[in-house]
Amino acid sequence: MRLLHFADLHLDTPFKWAKPQHAHQRRRALRTTLETICRLAEERQVDALTCAGDLYEHDRFTPDTAKFLRDTFSALAPLRVLLAPGNHDWFGPGSLYQQVEWSDNVHVFNTTQLTALPFTEGVTIWGAAHCAPANTPNFLDDFQVDRGGIHIGLFHGSEQGNLALQHSGKEPHAPFYADQIRRSGLHHALLGHFHKPVDGEFHTYPGNPDPLSFGEDGSRGAVVVEISDDGSITRERVRVATTTANDVRVDVTGATHHNAVLHRISEATAELHGAVRVTLEGTLEPDVDLRLLDIEASAPDHLDALLIQKGRLSIAESYDLERLAEEHTVRGQFVRDVLNSESLTEEQRQRVLITGLRALDANVNELEIL
């Protein structure tokens, strides 16, 4: 038996880090990715397409998204589509899952108990749903397979052994431990929630098929799962991402003018595509007229978007602080106050001094990066 598994597409996600136009483009790209997944399911002649939750955003989905999903999955018939709602697309009153009149080839699991769906070749799919956005318990607690054959789990949850390897801030929804899968009688579990792919002995996280934020790098895709007669599985990961999100660090040390910084950014991003976040670091010469928004606006055509942020970025000191501290001027008083402050670290002290002095000198452009 062959399945194509994916999860965590997050249709209609806001992409808060992106500008409105680019966020709109990224949301459209997620639809293209789902269409790519569906074509792959047909090309590989799988027995079913499975999704383990977070297919869309419950708080943001539109009627257009509902019709798109209905028609996209209906077009796959008679290929079966199995959906196990997660915490972002939980099943309940007002959910897209309840509003859509699905075609006969689509099955939506709708309870927090693992429910059997008999399949072909002696295989049973056991699926469950989140029915609230939070506080969903462990699906495997008190669950035990009660029949013969091959048994595959399909649900959205947090395998506790891998939680620390995921991006910080990931909430442990429906937490469980990997050894519970085998002890419950399941041969394997096809999962969702973790955006970083995991190939466990008895479980598979496909990862999100298209990056939603920076840091979600590497190959993004769906997983072709072959189930053998003894319940063992083989996996093939297939890239389906429409877009990419790249993180780049650029050292600006020694750059003496704005265009020199632009040139370094251009070199660092020349071979990249999609969205790129550039982190500037190093020591910037004090006379560089650098505006982050101007750099972002000059993004080359081969990039979808360019975001600039500061990392460990400092300004080369060009002021004689000892001499300035002796002045009976506003500048002198400012320098004395900052040097005598006990609440600042040395790095903070340098930033405050350079920023303040440049502002007093009417060189206010640097306020953007400090």
List PLM regions with ranges:
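Residue-level signal for alpha-helix termini/capping positions
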Residues: 27, 42-43, 74-77, 270
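Domain-start "cap" segments at the beginnings of catalytic or binding domains
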Residues: 1-22, 220, 226-248
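Accessory, non-catalytic peripheral segments of nucleic-acid enzymes
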Residues: 232-370
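Glycine-rich phosphate-binding loop signature in dinucleotide/nucleotide-binding domains
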Residues: 41-45, 146-148, 269-272
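Amphipathic, non-transmembrane alpha-helical secondary structure
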Residues: 31-42, 67-70, 140-144, 259-266
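His/Asp/Glu-rich metal-coordinating catalytic cores
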Residues: 48, 57-204, 208-221, 226
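Structural beta-sheet core signal
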Residues: 5, 51, 83, 153, ...
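N-terminal active-site segment of His-dependent metallophosphoesterases
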Residues: 1-68, 350, 354-370
